[in-house]
């Protein structure tokens, strides 16, 4: 897992393994290849590389992701927002999309995201809940979601087809 993070992000981030559940694997984007999500922090003096417009990853806040209205055939996209920037010491969730038979371990697996305001506790791979499917609509393919505790709330991170988005879930039932 450390090798995959180093392969994709080089020396710009460090794995934060302070909790027992600091990483999780699942097919988060629904392409039948297992992906990896792992807690990381920016490496000392590497913020300019992390935040570079030429970086090989996308920095995103799932709380600000555009989620198209369900069951609507024509959707008007919102105006573009300013790019997200990583701050010193910020805990992030790095997601590496898998590729081929080796999945996230494949040397060619390079599609990656750094998710801000999304690094929680109790990371787990789960199936989309009925609540998420009711709010988002039917997913175009089977996929997993990243279930977690974030700021005292239980919720999931899910792939919309263009970005990762946050969906709060009931704390009583975990799917």
Labelled PLM ranges:
Residues 1-30, 34-175:
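Beta-propeller-forming repeat regions
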């Amino acid at each position: 897992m450390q090798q995959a993070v180093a392969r994709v992000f080089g020396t710009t981030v460090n794995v934060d393994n302070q909790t027992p559940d600091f990483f999780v694997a699942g097919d988060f984007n629904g392409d039948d290849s297992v992906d990896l999500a792992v807690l990381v922090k920016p490496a000392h003096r590497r913020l300019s590389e992390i935040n570079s417009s030429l970086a090989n990853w996308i920095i995103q806040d799932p709380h600000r992701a555009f989620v198209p209205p369900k069951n609507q055939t024509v959707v008007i996209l919102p105006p573009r927002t300013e790019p997200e920037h990583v701050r010193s010491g910020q805990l992030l969730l790095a997601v590496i999309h898998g590729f081929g038979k080796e999945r996230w371990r494949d040397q060619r697996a390079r599609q990656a995201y750094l998710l801000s305001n999304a690094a929680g506790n109790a990371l787990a791979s789960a199936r989309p809940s009925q609540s998420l499917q009711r709010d988002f609509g039917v997913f175009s393919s089977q996929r997993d979601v990243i279930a977690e505790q974030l700021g005292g709330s239980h919720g999931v991170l899910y792939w919309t087809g263009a970005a990762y988005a946050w969906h709060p879930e009931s704390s009583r039932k975990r799917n």
